[in-house]
Structure formats: structure tokens, C-alpha cells
Amino acid sequence: MARSLCFMAFAVLAMMLFVAYEVQAKSTCKAESNTFPGLCITKPPCRKACLSEKFTDGKCSKILRRCICYKPCVFDGKMIQTGAENLAEEAETLAAALLEEEMMDN
């Protein structure tokens, strides 16, 4: 009986630590590639462009077929500036990103 009690205490402690580390995990920042030319069809060329821009990964967006680069955020909850020239372009990019995230969640 004492063994099962110790095992249960260990299991609960392990689960609490696992959950605590998951909550503190860094979020991922993303930005459109500045060097990738044209439409993004396959991942390898996009990833190569993103690695050359000092990102850790790159993937093609599903709707707009743009190369999106990813890396761990330095500041939690803050997105990397995409270099948009005007407010209308930023709003369009944000709307497309939100739509894409919503579609990926479903």
C-alpha cells in the first residue's frame, strides 16, 4: 500500500512538472521571407531561404502561397515586423494570417 501511495505521489508530481514546463514554453514568431521569390509551392526552398535569413524553419502558407519563416520568440507574444510598407498592406497580411491560423486550428 505504501508503494502505491509513493507511486501516485511521484506520478502527480511528474505531471505537475510536465504541465509547468509546457506553460512556460516559448512561443514561435513568424515573418514572411524577404528573400524567397514568387509563389511558395514546396517546403524545402522556403526552408532554405528562411535558414539564410537566420530563422529556424520555413513553411509555405496554405492560402496565399507565401514563404513564412519561423523562430522562437525573444519577447513572448510579440510578432516580428514583416517590413510592410503601409498600413493597408499590414492589415491585409494580418487578416490573411488570422484566417490561415483559424483554418489550421479546425
UniProtKB/Swiss-Prot annotation:
Gene Ontology cellular-component terms for this entry are: extracellular region; vacuole
Location in or out of the cell: Secreted; Vacuole
- Keyword set, alphabetical order: Antimicrobial, Disulfide bond, Fungicide, Plant defense, Secreted, Signal, Stress response, Vacuole
Cysteines engaged in disulfide bonds, as pairs = C29-C73, C40-C60, C46-C67, C50-C69
Q: Does the keyword Disulfide bond feature in the UniProt annotation?
A: yes
A Pfam family (short name) is Gamma-thionin
Q: Where is the signal peptide?
A: 1-25
**Which SUPFAM superfamilies would you find in this protein's record?**
Scorpion toxin-like
Assigned protein family: Belongs to the DEFL family.
Q: What is this protein called?
A: Defensin-like protein 1
Species of origin reads Nicotiana paniculata
The organism's taxonomy opens as: Eukaryota, Viridiplantae, Streptophyta, Embryophyta, Tracheophyta
